[in-house]
Regions:
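Short coil-to-helix segment of the ABC ATPase nucleotide-binding domain corresponding to the Q-loop/switch region
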Residues: 10-17
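Hydrophobic anchor residue at the start of the ABC signature
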Residues: 64
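Conserved ABC ATPase signature
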Residues: 50-54, 58-60
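Helix N-cap at the start of a conserved alpha-helix in ABC-type nucleotide-binding domains
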Residues: 86-88
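Conserved signature/switch motifs of ABC ATPase nucleotide-binding domains
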Residues: 49, 70, 102
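ABC nucleotide-binding domain "signature" region
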Residues: 29-41
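Catalytic Walker B motif of ABC-type/P-loop ATPase nucleotide-binding domains
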Residues: 75-78
Length: 140
């Protein structure tokens, strides 16, 4: 999520719908799932806005909505809370935790050790590209 690759000429709704359109999902299902994803990240009231009209934090959450709308089995998030204020960061990590609880494997790369301690069930510490340690992981 460091670079969301949002489509600037499309609305928030259209940005989130894109993976479902590509997969051939029906229009009614697209509408239901896109609105649910936007609601989960607190952007339902911004569905008609283009990304340029959103704050950096809102753009970050829009990218997250697009990532979760297709209900992936595995979600890899690189600094997903980087542009968010602390309260929103907690909300996003809470969303990730709920996704994990219903079967989505989450891999979150972050420098925010507080979030790791609060939400991570397992962690791996990397230093200089090498595994340095972590819960349940042998140091390299």
């Amino acid at each position: 999520f460091q670079d969301n690759k949002l489509l600037g000429d499309r609305s928030a709704y259209e940005n989130v719908a894109l993976p479902l359109i590509i997969n051939g999902t029906g229009e009614r299902e697209i509408g239901r799932r896109v609105r649910a994803a936007l609601d989960q990240v607190g952007l339902l009231d911004r569905e008609r806005y283009p990304p340029r009209a959103l704050s950096a934090g809102e753009q970050q959450r829009l990218g997250i909505a697009r990532a979760i709308v297709s209900r992936p089995k595995v979600l890899i998030a690189d600094e997903p809370t980087g542009n968010l204020d602390p309260d929103l960061a907690l909300e996003v990590m809470g969303l990730f935790k709920r996704l994990n609880e219903v079967g989505t494997t989450m891999l979150v790369a972050t420098h925010d050790l507080h979030l790791v301690e609060r939400f991570g069930s397992r962690r791996i510490v990397l230093a200089g590209g090498q595994v340095e340690g972590g819960a349940g992981v042998q140091a390299a």
